[in-house]
Amino acid sequence: MDQRNYTRVKEFTFLGITQSRELSQVLFTFLFLVYMTTLMGNFLIMVTVTCESHLHTPMYFLLRNLSILDICFSSITAPKVLIDLLSETKTISFSGCVTQMFFFHLLGGADVFSLSVMAFDRYIAISKPLHYMTIMSRGRCTGLIVASWVGGFVHSIAQISLLLPLPFCGPNVLDTFYCDVPQVLKLACTDTFTLELLMISNNGLVSWFVFFFLLISYTVILMMLRSHTGEGRRKAISTCTSHITVVTLHFVPCIYVYARPFTALPTDTAISVTFTVISPLLNPIIYTLRNQEMKLAMRKLKRRLGQSERILIQ
């Protein structure tokens, strides 16, 4: 059939996380607390790294960028989810859906590349400690961060450019709570088998490759640390363990969603909630609870703010 005869749908309807009103209220409270904690936790990391001069190192410079990404990434889906949990109708316009997918993959892609840059940073710190500050200069760190965002942009544009030309004539019901490629692609009024393979290659296989590359990289780093001794070795192992935990929590759901045929499974909703809303919360928790230097810096900043407040009152 000629694609010009198709009538493009004007909006999509979400089935949402649950159809139960009672459970919706419970989930609203839980996810609202998670989202607020995500914003405050990541914002606190940003402020601490910016205000504490002894944290002006490449590792914390990159960590601040990750916090910015986590705030933006969670804000792509969480506010809409919270609104829909209290709404009878859960709809989003076609243009709104495309916009959500664009920023979702832009920030998700930048997140993946940023985690790779952080692994490279740890490798240089362990393998070339005497030249670390020279190699990971402020200019180079900035360039790597910009490259991560550009990589996310290219990845997102590739997704959207493949999806936009497709005809969408109905149905318009998405069995999820946000717009993403696997669910939207299934609603196209044409054969999408080849396109699905391209999407799986772009998202899933790349996620697998980067995940294993990062695991191998951190394994090499940990093996290199066997020759180190003292407090520096303990701190380096703690930092690498935190990075490995964050990488695993990010990539396992990502691989589950994108590295398989785009067919709905009963566990999809739970995995998606973990991936989109809860994962950005875990990053600040992991990096602050396991990082004594960060915790000491936060206490120092708190004392400074307290002193400033007393001076203003006087």
Swiss-Prot record:
Database matches in CDD domains: 7tmA_OR4D-like
Keyword Cytoplasm: no
UniProt keywords, alphabetically: Cell membrane, Disulfide bond, G-protein coupled receptor, Glycoprotein, Membrane, Olfaction, Receptor, Sensory transduction, Transducer, Transmembrane, Transmembrane helix
Residue numbers on the Cytoplasmic membrane side: 50-57, 121-139, 220-235, 290-314
Any Pfam family matching the protein: 7tm_4
Positions annotated as glycosylated: N5
One GO molecular-function entry: G protein-coupled receptor activity
Coiled-coil regions listed in the entry: none
Bilayer-crossing regions: 26-49, 58-79, 101-120, 140-158, 196-219, 236-258, 270-289
GO cellular component: plasma membrane
Membrane topology according to the record: Multi-pass membrane protein
Residue ranges annotated as Extracellular topological domain: 1-25, 80-100, 159-195, 259-269
InterPro entries per record: GPCR_Rhodpsn, GPCR_Rhodpsn_7TM, Olfact_rcpt, Olfactory_Receptors
Keyword Membrane annotated: yes
Disulfide-linked positions: C97-C189
Localization per Swiss-Prot or TrEMBL: Cell membrane
Family that this chain belongs to: Belongs to the G-protein coupled receptor 1 family.
Protein purpose: Odorant receptor.
PANTHER family: OLFACTORY RECEPTOR
Name the UniProt record assigns to this protein: Olfactory receptor 4D9
Gene: OR4D9
